[in-house]
């Protein structure tokens, strides 16, 4: 088992924190994120790093049924865009209370690669709960990856927050677990 490149916790199963053979894509990506085991000057909130303190919240991305893939096709269809017209971030009631965020507030998600961040609407939910790992409480947020800069509805591109790395064997991107911060916009 390896933890994601950006993990809030220490890997207790293996002495190797992250995969030693993660894949990086283009030159731009190499400048923005890399494997701290093999390169200097990485911009990633790896466990125990200074960046990890600035981005304490675990983030995941997911789909909604109203949009397909990145939304390139479905963001042009009025009946679908009416159902999900805005980029949103799902936030637990506990984290919302801690941050002073209410349902419908515009919030900014930031990461080690995107300190300007992306904006989305807060969706306060009971579906997410804080969890305790190794004796410490962690929060998690979730956001979709269907929005972009074209279409009847547009919105922040969530993948602008995530690392440009993936599994070396399958090349599957590591968009499902990374660290962010969330604040009112």
Model features per residue range: what roles?
Residues 3-27, 54, 63, 70, ...:
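Long, contiguous, secondary-structure-rich segments that constitute the structural scaffold
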Residues 28-65:
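Extended boundary segments
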